[in-house]
């Protein structure tokens, strides 16, 4: 997969693509990244990319001309273009899976008051929000989405690891433990040391349901509606409800 990131500050995402699992995916050729500095397409000697908002109001807006040229430089018309904005559709694991099936994604990172609506109308396929809060940087929001997407691509992370993570099957992840067995008087649950795979599976499923019920009960209803809720899970849920 190819990621094109259009930004005024390429140094922000640059470090991410050179770090940890992402760096290995790039080295293997599974992922490619192209950081596009919008200022390279500005017209004046100051490389200006923003101006006042028509109709008044605080803040500045990114100019449409440099951004349009930047988008054309990555052949955006033939790719899926994502604009990260607080007013967009909420990002979730389902969208991450959908995006991971694309051959290329283009991210438009806004600053200040955002971007001209005409750019959105002309180029953008998806307006996406990473949460109900406002950030000063579209770059950070774009990296949240990229991180959730690239790890779902074949060859980046093992399938077993992905299957047991939070939101797999709409359940949150179970608690995990490592050495030592006793830490400040707290023991690792005995079942995890037993080597009995079926009992470990049951314990982990129970803990996933317990945590989801406590923290994100809405996900249980989603699992039911999508046909991903098993009889075993329903039995465990009833036990919690009867306690």
Curated annotation (Swiss-Prot):
Enzyme class, broadest EC rank: transferase
Positions bound to S-adenosyl-L-methionine: 110, 130-135
Subcellular compartments: Cytoplasm
GO terms for MF: tRNA (guanine(37)-N1)-methyltransferase activity
Alphabetized InterPro entries for the sequence: Alpha/beta_knot_MTases (IPR029028), tRNA_m1G_MeTrfase_C_sf (IPR023148), tRNA_m1G_MeTrfase_TrmD (IPR002649), tRNA_m1G_MTases_N (IPR029026), tRNA_MeTrfase_TRMD/TRM10 (IPR016009)
UniProt cross-references to CDD domains, sorted A to Z: TrmD-like
Keyword annotations: Cytoplasm, Methyltransferase, S-adenosyl-L-methionine, Transferase, tRNA processing
Pfam families recorded: tRNA_m1G_MT (PF01746)
Biological process per Gene Ontology, one example term: tRNA N1-guanine methylation
Gene3D superfamilies the UniProt entry points to: 3.40.1280.10, tRNA(m1g37)methyltransferase, domain 2
Catalyzed reactions per annotation: guanosine(37) in tRNA + S-adenosyl-L-methionine = N(1)-methylguanosine(37) in tRNA + S-adenosyl-L-homocysteine + H(+)
Official protein name in the record: tRNA (guanine-N(1)-)-methyltransferase
Gene name per UniProt: trmD
